[in-house]
Amino acid sequence: MKNKMKNIFIVASCFAAITCFSACDDWTEVENVNINTPGIEEQDPAAYAKYLQNLVAYKNSDHKVVYAWFDNSEKTPFSRGQHIADAPDSLDVISMMYPAELADFELADMQTVHAKGTKVVYTISFDKIQKEYTEKVKEGTETGSFDTYLKSEMDKQIGYAGSFDGMITEYKGNNPIYMSAEQKAEAKKYQDIFFSAVLTWKTANADKLLTFQGYPENLIEQTILTNCKHIILATDNVTDDAQLSVFARLAMAAAGVPTDRFVVAVSTASLDASDKQTGFYGTDRALTEAAYWTTEPSDGYTRAGLAIYNVQNDYYNATNTYQYVKEAINIMNPAPKK
């Protein structure tokens, strides 16, 4: 793995030198002129092919994984920062936030990142479905039961899966310890509907990726976690890295939770300069601190990697696109020193 990482970083440095000037222009220029600037793949196809080979081998090796949620709401892109093809090559999994009606450029970008060994998935969130249902009931636009609504939404959203390499299923819910018997039975009923649909899909698509996101300790007699590649803990709103360990301990204390696949969630900094909280632990960047946390030893569970919210925000740095995401990846999976 060390040699593969070394080769990846050497060739990646060459790519950076070729693209750095065009990246700076992204701050002000729109994509209304198609200028065909040869990249390294055209200038030295053999070197690029070797780079891709090493990159794919690295992603198939034992390393700290990196998930990233990408806001693909813009269907007429005016910046390279709106293309997943320009996300860091070392990302393992990119989750598209808007999986329906993918544009042609998005499908092309997906093929580009596939060549780099990156999987492209999307997220189905129980909590989001429940929130939308509650809002529609208040507005008077939904009169049916939540059972029926949930089943319908699962059918619709699982229908997007054909375009993707897998899915992330999010469930936060509430802790059953504090529920009455009636509340617990209702929560389990909804969990059964949600996860049985996911398991049916997974059984028919054994080769596709399934990952859990949320609070595993809130699951009631569910076996979904054994089918999940990773468990992404809902830590994106914590205020310091010590709380990452607390969330991991809470998860591992629950019955039936595999402890060899914990990934912690973190956000990039906001594009709103006045927002000094999103993406920070105090005055420190949460992304950097969480990356260091994954490298520390732990007793009883595995710190498997990071999941990054709003990854596209980090594209817009004056000195280096995706500066802090790349730094975090290098902290977790450093290139070997000579």
Q: Where does each model-flagged region fall?
A:
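C-terminal accessory extensions appended to soluble enzyme cores
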Residues: 51-56, 284, 295-338
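Short glycine-rich, acidic/polar surface loops and turns
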Residues: 289-295
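Bacterial Sec-dependent N-terminal signal peptides
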Residues: 1-61
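Chitinase-like catalytic core of GlcNAc-active glycosidases
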Residues: 60-251, 257-282, 301-303, 307, ...
